[in-house]
């Protein structure tokens, strides 16, 4: 399987970059890399883990919470997001969904 570099940028501007396989959820890979991210349901059914992707593509088809207008703005649920390219994602974006 392919491996991509994912860079997460936190609310204070802190950056963490790590590798994620294309069949691994970004949240799971972040935890393995020691990055502490917010989450709740781990099933794409809430918005606790929401981030905003500024570069790259993900597959988050297993999620159910986000609507098309969220996708158009780049919102991503890290608990159900598989990377499809190298990505840059701003984390902790739940409050901006509403």
From Swiss-Prot:
The keyword Iron applies. Its cofactor is [2Fe-2S] cluster. GO terms for biological process: electron transport chain. Signal peptide: none annotated. Residues 4-95 form the 2Fe-2S ferredoxin-type domain. Pfam families: Fer2 (PF00111). Its main location: plastid. InterPro entries: 2Fe-2S_ferredoxin-like_sf, 2Fe-2S_ferredoxin-type, 2Fe2S_fd_BS, Beta-grasp_dom_sf, Fd_pln. [2Fe-2S] cluster binds at residues 41, 46, 49, 79. One of its GO terms (cellular component) is chloroplast. Binds 1 [2Fe-2S] cluster. It is found in: Plastid, Chloroplast. GO terms for molecular function: 2 iron, 2 sulfur cluster binding; electron transfer activity; metal ion binding. Keywords: 2Fe-2S, Chloroplast, Electron transport, Iron, Iron-sulfur, Metal-binding, Plastid, Transport. PROSITE patterns: 2FE2S_FER_1 (PS00197), 2FE2S_FER_2 (PS51085). The keyword Transport applies. It comes from the Eukaryota. Ferredoxins are iron-sulfur proteins that transfer electrons in a wide variety of metabolic reactions. NCBIfam families: fdx_plant. In radish there are 4 ferredoxins: 2 are root-specific (R-B1 and R-B2), one is present in both leaves and roots (L-A), and there is a minor form which is leaf specific (L-B). Belongs to the 2Fe2S plant-type ferredoxin family. This is Ferredoxin, root R-B2. The lineage of its organism: Eukaryota, Viridiplantae, Streptophyta, Embryophyta, Tracheophyta.
